Amino acid sequence: MTALDIQISVEEGDWPSEDELQGLSTRILDVTVAFLIAEEKQPFPDDPPELSLVFTDDQSIREINAEWRNQDKPTNVLSFPAFPVTPGNMPGPMLGDIIVAYETLEREAAEMEKPFEEHLTHLLVHGFLHLFGYDHIEDDEAERMEGLETRILARLGLSDPYGDQPRIDSLEQ
């Protein structure tokens, strides 16, 4: 199976240690990669592609969101593909960056009455799918992406994040 070269950076926030985040992220994304290869026939390069995960706070992600998306507010996760990829096409050697905000993640998890780690898992899967060109702007795209998220999370032993909950509007690219 294709492994990922995951680079972790904890910038701000009350996150677990980098070692804990590395272990959790590796487990989550290995399952996600295996799913995409088996179920979506997603090709991967022979050499492990690099992925940057940045764990930060609401203030930092708000600034990034304002600069890159013209939305001056914090969000839970942002994804920045290194190269444009559409689902099913070969990604480059660098997948891109996923940035997660601690306070927003913590607040949303509490609102949904879900464990912090479970919501973090969902956000990492969500952000990772964005790096492969999946999106949720149009209803049909959102339905496809949410279906993939639900199936991947099921492989990780987690319930459907959209089942009984209203869709979180802040899940953004």
UniProtKB/Swiss-Prot annotation:
Which EC numbers does the record give? 3.1.-.-
- Alphabetized UniProt keyword annotations: Cytoplasm, Endonuclease, Hydrolase, Metal-binding, Nuclease, Ribosome biogenesis, rRNA processing, Zinc
A Pfam family it matches: YbeY
Q: Which cofactor does it need?
A: Zn(2+)
Gene3D superfamilies in the record, alphabetically?
Metalloproteases ('zincins'), catalytic domain (3.40.390.30)
For Zn(2+), which residues are the binding ones? 126, 130, 136
Q: Which PROSITE patterns match?
A: UPF0054
For this protein, the record's InterPro entries field holds: MetalPrtase_cat_dom_sf_prd, YbeY, YbeY_CS
Q: How is the cofactor bound?
A: Binds 1 zinc ion.
Intracellular or extracellular location(s):
Cytoplasm
Drop me one GO molecular function for this one.
metalloendopeptidase activity
A biological process from GO: rRNA processing
**Gene Ontology cellular component?**
cytoplasm
What superkingdom heads the lineage? Bacteria
Q: What family does this belong to?
A: Belongs to the endoribonuclease YbeY family.
Tell me which PANTHER family the record gives: ENDORIBONUCLEASE YBEY, CHLOROPLASTIC
Function noted in UniProt: Single strand-specific metallo-endoribonuclease involved in late-stage 70S ribosome quality control and in maturation of the 3' terminus of the 16S rRNA.
Q: What's the name of the protein?
A: Endoribonuclease YbeY
Organism of origin: Sinorhizobium fredii (strain NBRC 101917 / NGR234)
